[in-house]
């Protein structure tokens, strides 16, 4: 009994020791199931968002004034983020020099004589510039 015969006998012994019955192991005596089996995994919420459509406005659909306003807002958010990061870095610096003050926006929007809302935006941007410069100066004086 050598070679393939021995292998078959060992395989038969191993298979005879395997538990018979359900795929999931159960406690001795057939009590409660140790773990609930999900044949496709435990992904109960896999498809609950399938087929949903966005109800918000698409940024690519906007045209004309809406697009200009959106771009202006994006530029303002980007500049505000840069200034905030500059403040955080300046606060994290252990040096006692004051951070350089620079205007919030180096890009000055063109003024249309017909568009009074654009003038308000420019004035608001200047006001925000002055306020941020004041905050930076105060932070520089405290450190």
From Swiss-Prot:
Residue numbers of Methionine amide PTMs: 50
GO CC terms in record: extracellular space; neuron projection; secretory granule lumen
Predominant cellular place of this UniProt entry's protein: secreted
Polar residues bias (residue ranges): 92-111
InterPro entries per UniProt: Bombesin (IPR000874)
Subcellular location: Secreted; Cytoplasmic vesicle, Secretory vesicle lumen; Cell projection, Neuron projection
Record region (Disordered): 91-115
Residues of the signal peptide: 1-23
Family of the protein in this entry: Belongs to the bombesin/neuromedin-B/ranatensin family.
Name of the protein: Gastrin-releasing peptide
Organism for this UniProt entry: Cavia porcellus
Gene: GRP
């Amino acid at each position: 009994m050598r070679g393939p015969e021995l292998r078959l006998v060992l395989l038969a012994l191993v298979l005879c020791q395997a538990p018979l019955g359900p795929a999931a192991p159960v406690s001795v005596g057939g009590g409660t199931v140790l773990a609930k089996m999900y044949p496709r995994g435990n992904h109960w919420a896999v498809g609950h968002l399938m087929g949903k459509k966005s109800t918000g406005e698409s940024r690519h659909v906007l045209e004309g004034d809406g697009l200009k306003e959106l771009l202006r807002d994006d530029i303002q958010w980007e500049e505000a983020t840069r200034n905030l990061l500059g403040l955080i870095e300046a606060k994290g610096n252990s040096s006692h020099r004051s951070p350089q003050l620079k205007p919030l926006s180096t890009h000055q929007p063109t003024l249309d004589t017909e568009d009074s809302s654009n003038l308000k935006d420019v004035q608001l941007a200047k006001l925000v510039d002055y306020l941020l410069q004041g905050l930076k100066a105060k932070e520089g004086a405290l450190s």
